[in-house]
Amino acid sequence: NTRLALNDHDSNSGMNLLRHALAPLGRDSAFFAEVHISGGHLRSLAMVAAGEVELTSVDAVTFGYLQLHAPERLDGLRVLGRSAPSPALPLITSLHWSAAQRRELFEALNLTLIECPHLAATLALKSFLPAGEEHYRILLDYERQAQGWGYPQLR
């Protein structure tokens, strides 16, 4: 009779990675008595804390920021496990930007982190790295694997 809160059906950390973790265990089974769409990770965590649901899945960035800056929002909660690895959220810009413009952006962002260590610490960032579609293919692989195991959506 476990109830789940996920922020949205198109969430990587809130849905895709959890589905991938559960899919090989259930194979065509429903894991949850209820699945609630919360609209965001903070709301999902609040739903668990309030007893509205028993489980949610949030990204490590959100959880880490809360540990550092709002630990009271994690009162009464604990981490049960971790998902398969996933790339970080991408920075997105226009298709019309040149390679030089993209390089300049990364240089400026990384220089800012070096020159403003307090900002880097607040954001919990060490550096910005360029990434391409190939870095995110693993997420589609996770989706396909879950579908292949008969678990196309959390239920």
What are these language model-derived features?
Residues N16-L17, L66, A88-I92:
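Short, charged, surface-exposed secondary-structure boundary motifs
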Residues P24, A49, E54-L74:
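A ligand-binding cleft/hinge motif common to bilobed small-molecule-binding domains
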Residues P71-E107, A120-Y142:
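Periplasmic-binding protein-like
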Residues Q145-R155:
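Tryptophan-rich aromatic "cage" segments
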Residues N1-L45, E134:
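Bilobed "Venus flytrap"/periplasmic-binding protein-like clamshell domains
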Residues A108-H118:
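Generic non-transmembrane alpha-helical segments
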